[in-house]
Amino acid sequence: MGRFIFVSFGLLVVFLSLSGTGADCPSGWSSYEGHCYKPFNEPKNWADAERFCKLQPKHSHLVSFQSAEEADFVVKLTRPRLKANLVWMGLSNIWHGCNWQWSDGARLNYKDWQEQSECLAFRGVHTEWLNMDCSSTCSFVCKFKA
């Protein structure tokens, strides 16, 4: 009986130590603030990149940013993994005509760009957001809620 309690307690400690460490994200994905992220070095236009993300676990979307800290995390994640300088993000007004929205439906409460084009990308070396023609090809990051 004592051994059972010891083993059960040990398993509980392991479980609790893994929670919040990315254990909720699939292999190859990185965890931040309850979401999972994965950069893809496969240049695609914006619509194809969003479609590709939807085929990933939990129907992910192109990355959305809710804070400067989250944007910094993603830039640090992409810097060593992506060869491309420009990376798609999920913010566009492609389907909404002058009504910018994140492809994952997240609220637009953090912005860092000048509105000129229908799609946005960020530089993989810092968090500067750039207006891009949606038919251009860029690397991209997919994101889903863990």
Swiss-Prot record:
Subcellular location per the Swiss-Prot or TrEMBL entry: Secreted
InterPro entries: C-type_lectin-like (IPR001304), C-type_lectin-like/link_sf (IPR016186), C-type_lectin/snaclec_domain (IPR050111), C-type_lectin_CS (IPR018378), CTDL_fold (IPR016187)
Signal peptide feature range: 1-23
Tissue: Expressed by the venom gland.
Assembly, per entry: Dimer (non-covalently linked) of heterodimers of subunits alpha and beta (disulfide-linked).
Gene3D superfamilies with a match to the protein in the record: Mannose-Binding Protein A, subunit A
Keyword terms of this UniProt record: Disulfide bond, Hemostasis impairing toxin, Metal-binding, Platelet aggregation activating toxin, Secreted, Signal, Toxin
Function: Elicits platelet aggregation by the binding to the C-type lectin domain family 1 member B (CLEC1B/CLEC2). Binding leads to tyrosine phosphorylation in the cytoplasmic tail of CLEC1B, which promotes the binding of spleen tyrosine kinase (Syk), subsequent activation of PLCgamma2, and platelet activation and aggregation. Binding to GPIbalpha (GP1BA) and alpha2/beta-1 (ITGA2/ITGB1) may also induce aggregation, but this is controversial.
Residues covered by the C-type lectin domain: 32-143
Name of the molecule in the record: Snaclec rhodocytin subunit beta
Chief localization: secreted
GO MF: metal ion binding; toxin activity
One GO cellular component term: extracellular region
